[in-house]
Amino acid sequence: PMALVPGVSPRLWIGNAAKVAIHHDPTENIAVVGAGRRRFTLLPPEQVGNLYMGPFDPTPAGVQVSMVHLTAPDHARYPRFAAAMAAALIAELDAGDAIYIPYQWYHHVEALDRFNVLVNYWWDPVPDASPWEAMMHGFVSLRSLPPDQRRAWRAMFDRYVFLADGDPGAHLPPEARGVLGATSPQAIAQMRAMLFDGLRKRLRR
């Protein structure tokens, strides 16, 4: 396979008329059909509540998968799945065709022929960061809080992490913004040091 994305090694998949359950990857993804035909069903991340995802662990391939069989859904058991499919994008690819799957978009892949070849190019736009680790820390530190405290932290995350109201440090002079300022290697190193220090203290308890 050619080096379609600079610095990204392609991965080659050879198989039969198989199906890949609905899942998402924490990467950007370009999939190229080398042989056979494949049907891709893409669903935006906002549909997570309608997809009836399985556990985070254990998983068949390291990522969550939906409990719904897309080609034969049980709508009585999974009634919200119809709403997810209303937002779906579906593409059928022949050999030589390619599809871009955006970061964290859910997708189902169905190989339509008895012999199929697929080439994947996965890359992480921010390779030094791990939102998954942040989420795991949230499971430990936030999920068991009382509802009023979770609401308070949700407001904090919306403002300071997800920037729901714009730049939360815009009213401060640049030299006083601290972790609210521009993300630089030095700032990232400082925040990581704070995280490591906090984890070390908790592990000693």
Q: How should these model regions be labeled?
A:
Residues 5, 17, 33-100, 105, ...:
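Double-stranded beta-helix
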Residues 53, 113-129:
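A short hydrophobic beta-strand segment most commonly corresponding to one strand
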Residues 23-26, 33, 43, 111-113:
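Short glycine/proline-enriched turns and hinge-like loops at secondary-structure junctions
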